[in-house]
Every structure is written in C-alpha cells, then in structure tokens.
Swiss-Prot record:
The lineage of its organism: Eukaryota, Metazoa, Chordata, Craniata, Vertebrata. This is rRNA N(6)-adenosine-methyltransferase ZCCHC4. Residues 335-355 are annotated as: Regulatory loop. Residues 393-443 form the DHHC domain. InterPro entries: DNA_methylase_N6_adenine_CS, Mlase_EEF1AKMT1/ZCCHC4, ZCCHC4, Znf_GRF. It catalyses: adenosine(4220) in 28S rRNA + S-adenosyl-L-methionine = N(6)-methyladenosine(4220) in 28S rRNA + S-adenosyl-L-homocysteine + H(+). Belongs to the ZCCHC4 family. Zn(2+) 6 binds at C423, C426, H434, C436. Residues 480-489 have a biased composition (Basic and acidic residues). Keywords: Cytoplasm, Metal-binding, Methyltransferase, Nucleus, S-adenosyl-L-methionine, Transferase, Zinc, Zinc-finger. It comes from Rattus norvegicus. Residues 470-479 have a biased composition (Basic residues).
Length: 489
C-alpha cells in the first residue's frame, strides 16, 4: 500500500520535522483499562486536536482505518455517555457494514469455484466477485470476465480493482520488479514463512514460486480488503486492521496468525508490512509490537532475547519516527516501486524517484542490493547504497536519503539536500525561497530542538498553566454574566 504523490509534500513535512503545530494526534485514554468503542472497522482510536502546539481539552474516538468521515463517520467524545438504545443501534450499524458473505461462505464458494470447468468460471467486475453458476442471472447486466484461469485466481491483485481512495485504503501495489526482488531476498536470507501485513502482491509472488527454484516459503496475508477472502483458505488469509490489531473474524483468525508466527518455536519467520503512507506511525508501531509479542510467546527461553525480523516498507522521511519506536531499525537504500502509480516507478531520476524504502532490524551488511540497478557496497558503512549516495568523510556516513547526492554544510555540521542552501538568518539549511520564520521542528512548548511537544518534560506545567488560564477566563465570564443579571432583573 502507498499514498498518492499529491500527498507527498505534506507527508514529507510530517515525517521530517515531526508533529506539526496543528493537526490531530493519537492520545492516551484517561482510563487505559476501558475498552474503546467499536466502529465497523474494529476498536476506534482516541484522538486529540492540537492547535499551535496546544491540545484542545476534549479528546474524541474516531475510526482507526479511515481518515475521511465520508468513509466512516464514527465520532464520540471520550467523556460522552451513550444510552442503551444508541449502543444497540451502533451494534446493528456495525453488523450491517460487514461484507455480505461470511468467511466460511467465501471458503465454500472458493472450493466450488475451482472445481468448475474453465468455461463456467466467471468474475463480476462490477461487484468484484467470483461467480458460481447460480449467480449468473443476478449479474446478467453487469460487466463480466469469463474463462478465469487458475493463474488469474492465484493473482487476485491483478483481477481486483485497486482501492484507490487515498484517505482510506490508498492501495498501490508492488511492481513486479520490487516484488521479485523482495521474494528472492527473503529466500536468500533463509526465511521459510512470511507474514505479509498489507502486502497482497508479495503474498501472491511467494505462493507462485515454482517448487525447486528456491527453498519453499509459505505466506499468510493480513489485509483489511475483504475481497481477498474469496480467493484464499483460512490458513492463507485473515481480514485484519493493522491500525488497531483487529481480526475481523475473531479468535479463529487470531489463532491462525498465532500458529503461523509460533511454528517451529518462531524460527524462520519474517514480517513484511506495507502500510498506507497516510497512516499514523504510532498506532502502527503499537500493532506491530503486539504481533512481536505474539511471536515471542512461542519461543524457547534460550531465544527470548531475539527479535522478530521485520521489513517495514515506508517513505524515507518517516525514518526518525520509525526509529523512535524501533531503535534497532535501519533504513536501506533500496527504492520500492509500485505498479499502479505513475510516479513511484523504477527508472525515474532526481526528485521524482520513489521515496519508499525498507526499514529493518536485520543487519544491513546481510542484505545484498542488485548491482544491475546501480547499488554498490560501501566498505566503511558496511551496507549497500545507491549510485549517487556518496560517502561523506565529515559525517563518516553515506548520508543521502532520497537517491540524490547530498552536500555537506559545515555550518550545520551535516549533509543536506542539493537544493538547500544555508540561511544565516535561520541558522539552518533550507530551500532558497523559504520564509525566514525559524525552524518548524522542535518543541512547541519550551522551544527546545532536541525533542517534540509530546515528549516535553514541561508538558505537565504547560497544561496546568493552560488550565489556570481557562479557569480564570471562565470566572471572569461568570462574573460578567452575574453582573448583567443584576442590572436586568
């Protein structure tokens, strides 16, 4: 999954400078033990609006998966009390929003479909559904594809329309080049099982690998797109929301995932995840840590110190945010490309290269990147880097993040993008036409540049001061109201 290019600049801003002065952030609930209310996509997340670095007093619950209320309009204040009637109505609504077919029904239909002769295998493009002969009359006026081959059934991502709603799914799929590289790399590293979280095309590639070509690998796909339910048996697919660790088919699906991770005492498994770029890093990190904990439950005591190998595929400008939650992660130079995105494709140069990278806790010197694509090994950094990523003797590192050659700034004491120049007014490097209003990064509470607002040690004092100001204004307002009532009995 990926985000569209028109969101790239705003995403880069979010990733590179941390949280903005204004926006919406995930918040901690006042009562951590209380379950969050549920929307059709599972447990909701608690959010808080932030304006100029200050949190608004009331927090609210909203959908974890949908960033646009047109897709999921759930909204509830944290302190809001709902009647039994409203809770019952919400439960009915959540049930109505679920797919028309249960997981068991999808499996039954799939087993029937693959037994049909080729001439009777039809797919409704209008409804995005495999059709049995009994369904033909109902879909007679729809756009149909006939003679669905076994190969097509094995590649549902090419049969289904991508869900390109950029605020909900942003479903952009790996290009064959990147997909084949990833599958080959996983096999070279010796993995036997791959947990694909939001990576349907990699899941397909692994399952399509011909026996004998390389060591056999198995894959389990976790994805929120219910349409994949009709193409896989229960041991190959679980409908899953990666933003809240919600298995839509309950305990049975959770046990499938658990067994997959804990097989062979957790050895030989890796998690590969490709979240929507517009998703918040914090809830993703929380979810991935729950999957890691699930994996650790199956380990022997001798292996309790080990980490679950992970490939997290995300834009390079989220590096600091990802490493904040997973300090052992490093970013590889490999540029991941997407098949159905005009700008995230191989062969582009300069600023328009794909910004998508692989973050991993596997030592980078073990990961060989393809030399035919221009990657080379830096003996000093002990990792493969892109062609233009030159080693800086001052930083003692290959510093480029975006595939271009970066320049060292002796004032900032670090390498910066080639389009940036040093501004003496701001005392930092920036674009030539920037506004000299000072850096946007740093803490909006105390002004320090070494942490963000959410980690500020003064946040408690700041909140107390804000509360005191609000109370003072409220007392003044009440006093004016009382005086007005006296004057107008």
């Amino acid at each position: 999954m990926a985000a569209p290019m028109d969101c790239l600049e705003s995403l880069e801003g979010e990733g590179s400078v941390g949280r903005r002065a204004s926006g919406v952030e995930v918040a901690l609930p006042s009562n951590p033990g209380a379950p969050a209310p549920q929307c059709p996509h599972g447990p909701t997340l608690l959010f808080v609006k932030v304006s100029q670095g200050k949190e608004e007093p009331r927090k609210f619950y909203a959908c974890s998966a949908c960033r646009d209320r047109k897709d999921c309009n759930f909204f509830q204040w944290e302190d809001e009390k709902l009647s039994e009637a409203r809770l019952a109505a919400r439960e009915i609504h959540n049930q109505r929003c679920q797919p028309p077919l249960s997981r068991a029904q999808c499996i039954e239909r799939y087993l029937s479909f693959i037994q049909l002769p080729l001439t009777q295998r039809k797919f409704c493009r209008s409804c995005q559904q495999l059709l049995l002969p009994a369904d033909w009359r109902e879909h007679g006026e729809h756009q149909l594809s006939a003679d669905i081959s076994t190969t097509q059934i094995a590649r549902p991502s090419q049969l289904l329309y991508p869900l390109e709603n950029k605020k909900t799914h942003a479903q952009y799929l790996f290009a064959d080049r990147s997909c084949q590289f990833l599958a080959g790399l996983l096999a070279t590293l010796g993995f036997r099982r791959v947990l694909c979280v939001g990576a349907p095309r990699l899941h397909e590639q692994i399952r399509l690998t011909a026996p004998g070509e390389k060591p056999d690998m198995r894959s389990l796909l976790l994805d929120i797109d219910f349409r994949y339910s009709q193409f896989y048996l229960e041991e190959s697919f679980c409908r899953y929301n990666m933003f809240n660790h919600h298995f839509f088919d309950g305990k049975a699906a959770l046990e499938v995932c658990k067994a997959f991770l804990q097989e062979e005492e957790g050895k030989g498994v890796i998690m590969v995840t490709d979240p929507p770029f517009g998703g918040l890093v914090e809830p993703l990190a929380v979810t991935f840590k729950k999957l890691i904990a699930m994996w650790k439950e199956g380990q022997s005591q001798d292996d309790s110190h080990k980490e679950l190998p992970i490939f997290w595929i995300f834009p390079y400008f989220f590096e600091s945010r990802i490493c904040q939650f997973f300090p052992s992660f490093c970013m590889l130079d490999y540029q991941v490309d997407y098949d159905n995105h005009a700008l995230y494709k191989h062969g582009k140069t300069g600023r328009k290269q794909s910004p998508v990278r692989i973050f991993t806790n596997i030592p980078p010197n073990k990961i060989i990147l393809p030399s035919e694509e221009g990657y080379r090994f830096c003996s000093v950094c002990q990792r493969y880097v892109s062609r233009e990523n030159q080693h800086c003797v001052h930083c003692n590192s290959c510093t480029s993040k975006d595939g271009r050659k970066w320049s060292h700034c002796f004032f900032c004491k670090k390498c910066v993008k080639p389009s940036w120049i040093h501004c003496n007014t701001c005392n930092r490097c920036a674009l030539p036409d920037h506004s000299c209003l000072g850096p946007k990064d740093g803490c909006f509470i105390c002004g320090s540049l070494d942490h963000k607002r959410s980690n500020c040690p003064s946040i408690g004092a700041s909140q107390r001061a804000n509360n005191a100001v609000r109370k003072q204004k409220q007392r003044k307002s009440n006093k004016i109201r009382r005086e007005a009532l006296k004057d107008n009995p």
